[in-house]
Each structure stands twice: as C-alpha cells, then as structure tokens.
Amino acid sequence: PRSVSSAASDVYKRQLFDQILALEWIQEYVAYFGGDASNVTLIGESAGAGGIGHLIASPLSKDLFHKAVHQSGGSSLTYPTSSSNVRKLANSFANSFNDPSIKNLKNISAEEVLEVSEEVYAEHYFNYVDDGFSVNRNLSDSYKSGNIQNVDLLIGSNNDEWSLYFDGNVNIRLWLDQETTPEKKIKLLELLTDIEDPVRKMDLLITAKNFVCPSLFMAEELKRNGGKTWVYQFNRVRDDELAQKYGAFHGAELPYVFDTHDQWLPTNKADKVLTEEIQSYWLSFAKTGDPNNDGAVVWPEYESSNDSTLVLDNEIYQRSHESSEICKIMDLF
C-alpha cells in the first residue's frame, strides 16, 4: 500500500496492510464499476470485525472508508498482542530447526511447520499485533485518546458467543481469579446469583468480556469522536434441540445477514422474517448511514447513559444491554 511503502521490515500487521491496499484500490477504481468512493462501508464478523476495529484506529486508513458494521469482535481490545512477544515466539519457532536461516526455513515441509507450530504456538492466540506503526499506541488507548477515524458504526454481538467452545469443564471462580480482581469477582458473583446454570453463567461472563464490553466501549468512543453509532444484540435461537443447547452462538447471525440458511439447523417463517428485517437495517445503514427505514422497528442511536441496544429476536425491541452491569463491574477500559 502507498501508505506503508516506507515501513521497515519488522513485526507489523501485514494482514491489515492487505486490507488497506484493498481500500486504496476501491478509492481509485470503484467508480469504473458504478460504485461511490465517498460512501464505502466495511462489514466484518469475528476476526473480520477485529480488522475493522484496527482500521478505525489506524492513521493509514484515513479517508478510505466511511461506515462500518462490526459483528462479534473485540478480543483485540481485551487481549492485545505485543510485538516483543511475537518476536520471541518467532525466534523460538526458527530455533526449533537445525538451521534457522531464512533460506533453510523456506525449504521446510508443511508437515514440519505444523508439528513445530503446535508446540511453540500452543498457548498463543493469533491476534493483531500492537506494532506502534499501523496503530500509534495500544488499541484501547487509541480509542480513548480520540486517535481514530471519524466514521459511523453499527456494532453488536450474540447472546451466547462462547457456547460452542466449552469442553464440559466450567470453573467460574477460577476464571474470575485469572481474569479480574478479588473485589470485582465478589461483585460479579453477586450479580449473577440468580443464574443457576454454571455454563450459562460462564458464557455470559466470557461473552461480556470478549464481545459486549469492547462493543459498548467502541460505540461510546466513536460517538464521542463525532460519529453516529448503533448497538444490537442477536438473541434468536432456532426451534431445534441442538439449537437450544447452543443458543445464539458465535456466528449464528451470519445466515440472517446474508440470507444463507442451510439444513444444519431448521429454518422457519420466523427466521425468514428476521432475515428480511436484519438485511433492511444493514443495507439501509450501508446506503444512507442510518439503519432506520420505513416499516422497521425504530433503532435509536447508542447512548451510554442507558446502553441503548436493539434486540434482534423473534420480536425486535429496544432496551438497555443486559450485560451492561457486568461491563461496568469489569471496567476493562
């Protein structure tokens, strides 16, 4: 990309550079395809949403896009990866071979790479790296300082983001010991006293920390920076025994956004109606910068005073986010 051509060869967000290159291409050529370079909307889910979170904070993406749909992302804010840690892991990986030179590493088989990677990177989450170049500082600090793009944002997450990833061993107190302070642990346990199912309780906590709290934080900071923001919570659970087990899991909203329902879970009239409603919000936001459109339930802009959220379920309605109190206690940012 033009904006990174002078970068030294170091630990940078190469994936982010690819995204910036694509956005530069859109600015230069989209008009030839009937597009509008002054009305570019990004949409991403999970890791894709993480990329959007960094593009919003990157000085390299200035004026390359104007709106963003951020679905079920946020771990980059709660679990930043330092460039020094990445260098240590890279050196450990290279030194696992007799000859760690670049020339030799290029000739290593895929099987050898996978075998060593499983050991070296066993506990490593491949998140975006805080490199001090593509983003000037720690990501959350960039948002708090206002060093972000002035764009509009539609952001949210699902009710049961972590339900697919439990292995049957749920130890809430141990997790709280690792993730928060003793004082916050007591408050969180008191807040969740009425929830009897330990898996649901754990899911609620992890969903809040990794998805909800970062989303509310981003919505507030972009609004404070002059952008308009809307927050949603996807709660729809299919009418099926398997669906009831996992709830509104990570990625469950995607078939509704893109109308790509398949046979893995049953799809009925309620799902089709919700699909049309979600698509109308998303498309209206991309076209006009406002998700509200004729016939749809009104979606108010986000206000931190009440954590205003649009719930997408069998019925669509507005309320304060159910995890806002968890986020206030966690106080992550």
Please provide the spans of the model-predicted regions.
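Single conserved hydrophobic/aromatic residue that forms the stacking wall/gate
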Residues: 1-12
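Alpha/beta-hydrolase active-site loop
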Residues: 13-31, 88
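Active-site loop->helix "elbow" adjoining a glycine-rich segment at hydrolase catalytic centers
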Residues: 14, 46-49
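Substrate-access "cap/lid" subdomains that shape
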Residues: 28, 62, 71-176, 202-224
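Alpha/beta-hydrolase fold nucleophile elbow
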Residues: 34-45
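Alpha/beta-hydrolase-fold catalytic nucleophile elbow
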Residues: 43, 58, 69-72, 155-157, ...
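Short glycine-enriched nucleophile-adjacent loop
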Residues: 49-61
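Mobile gating loops/cap/lid regions near enzyme active sites that modulate substrate access
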Residues: 213-333
